[in-house]
């Protein structure tokens, strides 16, 4: 399971929302072997006044943050592969350069998740976590 949050300046984020979601999802499906129907993305388009962009490093008003919460268990290689794919595909799909993209992966134990009325470690999944 993964929950994905995407933050950016509204006038930059909203026009690319669909393409960005498709790019992110393709990365998760490939790198983490998620089923194609497992897409949980939430977009947070912010007013410029509510989104401070770190200076330097070539950042622009396209600066975007992707936060991915997921079950623990993926290998370091799988997580790094996901990050590499995100930098590549987000740039191609949404014209957000690697300098403008920040990615955070946060893993937690399955027992810290609750969905479908149960604790995450009690639910049978139709995909592997240990990739």
How would you describe each model-predicted region?
Residues 1-131:
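A domain-level signal for the structural core that forms small-molecule/cofactor-binding pockets
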């Amino acid at each position: 399971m993964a929950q994905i949050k995407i933050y950016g300046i509204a006038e930059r984020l909203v026009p690319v929302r669909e393409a960005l979601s498709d790019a992110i999802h393709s990365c998760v499906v490939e790198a983490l072997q998620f089923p194609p129907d497992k897409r949980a993305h939430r977009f947070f388009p912010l007013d410029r006044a509510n989104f401070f962009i770190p200076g330097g490093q070539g950042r622009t008003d396209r600066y975007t943050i992707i936060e991915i919460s997921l079950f623990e268990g993926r290998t370091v290689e799988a997580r790094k592969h996901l990050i590499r794919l995100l930098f590549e595909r987000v740039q191609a799909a949404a014209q957000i350069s690697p300098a403008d993209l920040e990615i955070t992966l946060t893993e937690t134990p399955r027992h810290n998740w609750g969905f479908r009325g149960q604790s995450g470690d009690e639910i049978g999944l139709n995909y592997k976590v240990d990739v």
